[in-house]
A protein has these predicted regions:
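Extended, highly charged alpha-helical segments
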Residues: 106, 117-180
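N-terminal accessory targeting/assembly segments
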Residues: 1-114, 118
Length: 180
């Protein structure tokens, strides 16, 4: 007789972040955050808090202002001691590689933006080989511009013996070549 084991998948908790700008009023931001929360739920995450900030436009460094970043960090620190700490922060916009890196450095949790969340959902739901390939291609296209400065700790790879080749290629160049 077969035994069935019911495994409980741990739901990852998340907070979501959106901006209220002159181009996007509070009502519209709330609608977008409702949709983002639904997407997070679809991906298997439970949203425990929303953060919004009223600004003229996103910061090129961290998307949100430093004060709001500190507020989110304090909330994450508070939740750290609880049974269910927050594992990710999801932003309701597309973030640059620089913004993701700076936010991850400040908050010490996984950072996602709307596009990466949607791609994750597609990857989870893809059934056929063709669908899986299309999703993987879309993920690579999304990742390609974000590779810059992810490998700053690595210098150029060795090129070969002196006089035969140049200094070699960087890890970034290798990753870009592989993805293409």
């Amino acid at each position: 007789m077969k035994e069935f084991v019911i495994s409980e998948t741990k739901v990852e908790t998340a907070v979501i972040v959106g901006l209220i700008t002159p181009q996007q009023n509070e009502r519209k931001t709330t609608e977008y955050l409702n949709e983002l929360e639904f997407l997070a739920d679809t991906a298997g995450a439970k949203v425990v808090r929303r953060f919004t900030q009223r600004v003229n436009g996103p910061s090129s460094v961290t998307y949100i202002g430093s004060g709001k970043l500190e507020e989110i960090a304090a909330f994450l620190k508070q939740k750290e001691d609880e049974e269910d700490p927050v594992g990710m922060v999801i932003f309701d916009d597309e973030l640059s590689a620089k913004q993701i890196r700076n936010i991850e450095k400040a908050l010490q949790v996984k950072i996602l933006d709307r596009t990466s969340l949607i791609l994750d959902i597609f990857a989870m739901r893809a059934q056929t080989a063709a669908a899986k390939t299309q999703v993987e291609l879309a993920q690579y296209r999304y990742m390609l511009p974000r590779l810059t400065r992810l490998w700053t700790h690595l210098e150029r790879q060795r090129g070969g013996s002196v006089g035969l080749r140049g200094p070699g290629e960087t890890q970034l160049e290798m990753d870009q070549r592989i993805i293409r």
